[in-house]
């Protein structure tokens, strides 16, 4: 009996489980691993003191990108583009590779010259005047190394000279001459490209330390200033700006460091600059602007970064130059303007770069551009309603009277017609 009851209970349990599986099959849902930025952003909704959090820059003030590439498995790709790899190295590593390449090639061919002399037996007939060696006066590895340097650098033979009785030496001489020319072209080319890089030219392109938000021509604008310290100008200069801000889509996807274009005059051509003196770059905050709904009180709470990029060709070399900088929320001043730096002197304009980064406070509403537009619309609406509403009300009353009293309207029309006939008579 006990075994029968146990068997019956087990079957009931199995049948119940199978029915449950038929009704509702459990599915193991694996939550995707959030990016590190998203995991860091999760407790921010609970934290009240968000303004004190340090915002991690995407681009530093000096223009260097604050991004490190990790877990790169396909490192062979760096060797396929060996020229760019060498140019991107620091100067100390570049000079070390430069010296090592020449030293290794000299030692390699010096070893081969010594082996040829050793195999031919030239070392055993150094003092024999009747013996014709492959290379005269080559009596050891040091002399072979010096002969290799003389051959590859083409400084001219002196005490050691190759003879015509050594065909293997002649072939080796041709190989070393060709490979030496290739090494010279490659290494000198790398050094020339590294020296002529326009990165240092970007050091003389300066951006203001702060960006400002104030009114300009009755519109709320975001502004920053750029300048060129050199007398040789940047040709075909253009500027653009990006807003770096993490976002979450309506489907729940988290996009870290989402990039949004900031219009600084692309459609009007104001983004193309004649950068002879410092210029103030302006972005009008309108409905297409990402700052449309941001007010003065909300700005410190936002976690965003504005990346500005200035590009152009160096007048002296014709190479493309790019300068970058960025502004975080703590570097955006609401209600300020830049101090003028350009003054007219006797026959020329003078730029005072001591005041390049200075700002002064000005009267600016603390509302967002959206709120200002709504207030402006509310101020204009009663003027239009006062005329149109009265006309509509008058028309509606007339139509209602006509619908209610159609007979009276016909009698009035008849009376008017009789009066006209009597007046004619």
Swiss-Prot record:
A motif (PDZ-binding) lies at residues 422-425. It holds the Pfam family IRK_C. One of its GO terms (biological process) is potassium ion import across plasma membrane. GO terms for cellular component: monoatomic ion channel complex; plasma membrane. InterPro entries: Ig_E-set, IRK_C, K_chnl_inward-rec_Kir, K_chnl_inward-rec_Kir3.2, K_chnl_inward-rec_Kir_cyto, Kir_TM. Belongs to the inward rectifier-type potassium channel (TC 1.A.2.1) family. KCNJ6 subfamily. Inward rectifier potassium channels are characterized by a greater tendency to allow potassium to flow into the cell rather than out of it. Their voltage dependence is regulated by the concentration of extracellular potassium; as external potassium is raised, the voltage range of the channel opening shifts to more positive voltages. The inward rectification is mainly due to the blockage of outward current by internal magnesium. This potassium channel may be involved in the regulation of insulin secretion by glucose and/or neurotransmitters acting through G-protein-coupled receptors. This is G protein-activated inward rectifier potassium channel 2. It comes from Mesocricetus auratus (Golden hamster). The lineage of its organism: Eukaryota, Metazoa, Chordata, Craniata, Vertebrata.
